């Protein structure tokens, strides 16, 4: 095991901050919550989804009849702003919460999540399975209890489902190594979340993919031309 | 990994963008011809030059993942990542316990419902979309 794929909490917070910057640009709804003593914190997002019904008539653009709202449109609106088509009485709105925390023991990020109906009734794990994308179902169904466990949220102290982090460094390593070969800075959080998110119904908009490489900054060209100029003048 | 040579089965020689040395069989795995699958087409039923319908995808293996003998494919724009998963898994004969990841920009996994046409618009260059793929035991 090499050290590259592990990082400390500070690095975790840095990547989260960069991730959230982009989220804010595109209105994707992620925010940072610090713990009471501000020594640590986590990233979180809430989104609403209609189960077993037609699409929520939200700005009239969603044509998804399946269970997911496109993430780009699933902003985090206050409930009274959410335009639910009143005629879809068979539909129920489910509130999904996703939290990204740092695991000190595994030294990787961990995805915590939970879902509940609007009246507060929590969804059971088997209900959450229905939202898992087909391509992950096969593998996850083989041993769901190996991969998703219920644990107490380290900061909130409430029960959440957790995507077990024991394999995270293993599947992140090839990706990171590959990127390092071409000297590209990868936002670990972006990359990791893009991979694990869909398994629990969380999809990242494509723009995150290009945001990560933009963070490297383009200072070189400008600075050197300025330097050249000043040299010439003298 | 020396995996740069590929056979462009579905491209008529005259339109092949890179005039490369013919197929170098990858030493690690000799994968058989793909099962006929609706997901991607190695066939010649329509010229790839008609970029409205199909796009070129170049598949590159990451880590210890087996390298596909044929890396270049012409794929309908509306095909999803999910469709590519199914195709590659069959081609590489992955078992259910193995998870496959597909990346753009070498580091970002698009959601399974994403269409390759959109990915091509955003991340394609030199007339093709490069996708990296990696198998792993992501869970458990």
Swiss-Prot record, chain B:
Q: Which organism is it from?
A: Bos taurus (Bovine)
Per its UniProt record, what CDD domains does this chain match? Ubl_ATG12 (cd01612)
User: What are the alphabetically sorted keywords of the record?
Assistant: Acetylation, Autophagy, Cytoplasm, Immunity, Innate immunity, Isopeptide bond, Membrane, Ubl conjugation pathway
Q: Which InterPro entries match?
A: Atg12, Ubiquitin-like_domsf
Question: How does it associate, per the subunit comment?
Answer: Forms a conjugate with ATG5. Part of the minor complex composed of 4 sets of ATG12-ATG5 and ATG16L1 (400 kDa); this complex interacts with ATG3 leading to disruption of ATG7 interaction and promotion of ATG8-like proteins lipidation. Forms an 800-kDa complex composed of ATG12-ATG5 and ATG16L2. Interacts with DHX58/RIG-1, IFIH1/MDA5 and MAVS/IPS-1 in monomeric form as well as in ATG12-ATG5 conjugate. The interaction with MAVS is further enhanced upon vesicular stomatitis virus (VSV) infection.
Crosslink Glycyl lysine isopeptide (Gly-Lys) (interchain with K-? in acceptor protein): position given as 140
Q: Which GO terms describe its cellular component?
A: Atg12-Atg5-Atg16 complex; autophagosome membrane; phagophore assembly site membrane
Q: Which family does it belong to?
A: Belongs to the ATG12 family.
The gene name on file is ATG12
Write down what this protein is called.
Ubiquitin-like protein ATG12
* Major place of residence: cytoplasm
GO MF, one annotated term? protein tag activity
User: Is-annotated flag, keyword Nuclease?
Assistant: no
Q: What is known of its domains?
A: Shares weak sequence similarity with ubiquitin family, but contains an 'ubiquitin superfold' and the C-terminal Gly is required for isopeptide linkage.
Pfam families xrefs: APG12 (PF04110)
Its annotated compartments are: Cytoplasm; Preautophagosomal structure membrane
GO BP terms: autophagosome assembly; autophagosome maturation; autophagy of mitochondrion; glycophagy; innate immune response; piecemeal microautophagy of the nucleus
Task: Report the superkingdom from the record.
Answer: Eukaryota
User: What membrane topology is given?
Assistant: Peripheral membrane protein
PTM summary: Acetylated by EP300.
* Role this protein plays: Ubiquitin-like protein involved in autophagy vesicles formation. Conjugation with ATG5 through a ubiquitin-like conjugating system involving also ATG7 as an E1-like activating enzyme and ATG10 as an E2-like conjugating enzyme, is essential for its function. The ATG12-ATG5 conjugate acts as an E3-like enzyme which is required for lipidation of ATG8 family proteins and their association to the vesicle membranes. The ATG12-ATG5 conjugate also negatively regulates the innate antiviral immune response by blocking the type I IFN production pathway through direct association with RARRES3 and MAVS.
Where is the stretch described as Disordered? 1-52
Record has Chaperone as a keyword: no
């Amino acid at each position: 095991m090499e050290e590259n794929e592990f990082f400390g909490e500070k690095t975790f917070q840095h990547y989260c901050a960069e991730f959230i910057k982009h989220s804010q640009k595109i209105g994707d709804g992620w925010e940072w919550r610090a713990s009471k003593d501000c020594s640590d914190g986590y990233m979180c997002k809430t989104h609403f989804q209609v189960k077993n019904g037609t699409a929520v008539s939200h700005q009239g653009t969603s044509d998804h009849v399946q269970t997911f709202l496109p993430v780009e449109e699933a902003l985090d609106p206050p409930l009274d702003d959410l335009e639910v088509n009143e005629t879809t009485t068979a539909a129920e709105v489910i509130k999904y919460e996703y939290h990204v925390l740092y695991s000190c023991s595994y030294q990787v990020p961990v995805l915590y999540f939970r879902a509940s109906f609007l009246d507060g009734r929590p969804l059971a794990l088997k209900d959450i399975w229905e939202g898992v994308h087909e391509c992950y179902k096969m593998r996850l169904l083989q041993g769901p209890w190996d991969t998703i466990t219920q644990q107490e949220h380290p900061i909130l102290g409430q029960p959440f489902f957790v995507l077990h982090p024991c394999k995270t460094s293993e599947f992140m390593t090839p990706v990171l190594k590959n990127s390092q070969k071409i000297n590209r800075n990868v936002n670990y959080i972006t990359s990791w979340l893009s991979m694990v998110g869909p398994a629990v119904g969380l999809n990242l908009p494509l723009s995150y993919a290009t945001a990560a490489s933009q963070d490297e900054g383009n200072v070189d060209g400008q600075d050197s031309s300025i330097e050249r100029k000043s040299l010439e003048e003298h | 990994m020396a995996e740069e040579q590929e056979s462009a089965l579905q491209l008529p020689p005259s339109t092949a963008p890179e005039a490369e040395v013919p197929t170098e069989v990858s030493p690690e795995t000799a994968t058989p011809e793909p099962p006929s699958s609706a997901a991607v087409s190695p066939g010649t039923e329509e010229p790839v030059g008609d970029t409205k319908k199909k796009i070129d995808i170049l598949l590159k293996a990451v880590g210890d993942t087996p390298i596909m003998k044929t890396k270049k494919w012409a794929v309908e724009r509306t095909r999803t990542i999910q469709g590519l998963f199914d195709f590659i898994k069959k081609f590489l004969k992955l078992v259910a316990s193995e998870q496959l990841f597909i990346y753009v920009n070498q580091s970002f996994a698009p959601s399974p419902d994403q269409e390759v046409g959109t990915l091509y618009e955003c991340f394609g260059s030199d007339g093709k979309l490069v996708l990296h793929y990696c198998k792993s035991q992501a869970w458990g």
